[in-house]
């Protein structure tokens, strides 16, 4: 599940902080490990955060990175399979289409790493502590899939 879902978990933690609990369901697939998982991240407030990761789709599906964030005054939509890839849909008014650099999350992540080890100045995206917390969250998600229960962090 780490390779499958760590990027989703990193993003959730980066945007919303450390959850108090997780509740996950998953499917063991052809890899012999979790090949599809859905997690609800539980916070003390009223946030509703769900992330899904999987690689058992039919080959014709392709690969998609996406998110939907529903806010009080707008909805933010991103999908690597759609054009435009990123839209801001305000409650009132016309949709806004911010510029998004060409590429995908993986290529940007690799370039960031290469720049970092090459000694180029790079912006810190997450701290080592946040990286460790992402692994803690993933381990809690795995336990939740096994026990079919919420797991506290």
Residue ranges and their predicted role:
Residues 2-3, 10, 104, 129-132:
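A generic "alpha-helical surface" signal
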Residues 3-83, 110-121:
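Contiguous beta-strand/loop segments that form the cofactor/metal-binding neighborhood of enzyme cores
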Residues 8, 109, 134-138:
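Alpha-helical packing segments of well-folded alpha/beta enzyme cores
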Residues 21, 97, 152:
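Conserved beta-strand positions that form and line the central face of beta-propeller blades
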Residues 41-45, 88-93:
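Short acidic, glycine-rich loop/turn motifs
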Residues 42-44, 114-153:
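C-terminal helix-rich "cap/oligomerization" subdomain common to oxidoreductases
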Residues 50-53, 76-80, 89, 94-103:
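Short amphipathic beta-strand/extended segments with alternating polar/hydrophobic composition
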Residues 99-111, 126:
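Active-site loop of classical SDR/Rossmann-like NAD(P)-dependent oxidoreductases
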């Amino acid at each position: 599940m780490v390779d499958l879902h760590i990027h989703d978990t990193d993003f959730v933690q980066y945007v919303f902080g450390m959850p108090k609990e997780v509740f996950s369901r998953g499917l063991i697939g052809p890899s012999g490990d979790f090949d599809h998982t859905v997690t609800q991240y539980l916070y003390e407030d009223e946030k509703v955060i769900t992330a899904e990761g999987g690689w058992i789709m039919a080959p014709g599906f392709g690969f998609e990175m996406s998110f939907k964030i529903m806010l009080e005054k707008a909805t933010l939509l991103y999908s690597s399979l759609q054009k435009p890839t990123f839209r801001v849909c305000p409650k009132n008014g016309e949709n806004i289409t911010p510029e998004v650099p060409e590429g995908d999350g993986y290529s940007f992540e690799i370039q960031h790493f290469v720049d970092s080890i090459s000694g180029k100045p790079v912006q810190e995206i997450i701290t080592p502590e946040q990286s460790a917390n992402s692994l803690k969250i993933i381990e809690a998600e795995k336990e939740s899939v096994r026990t079919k229960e919420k797991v506290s962090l």
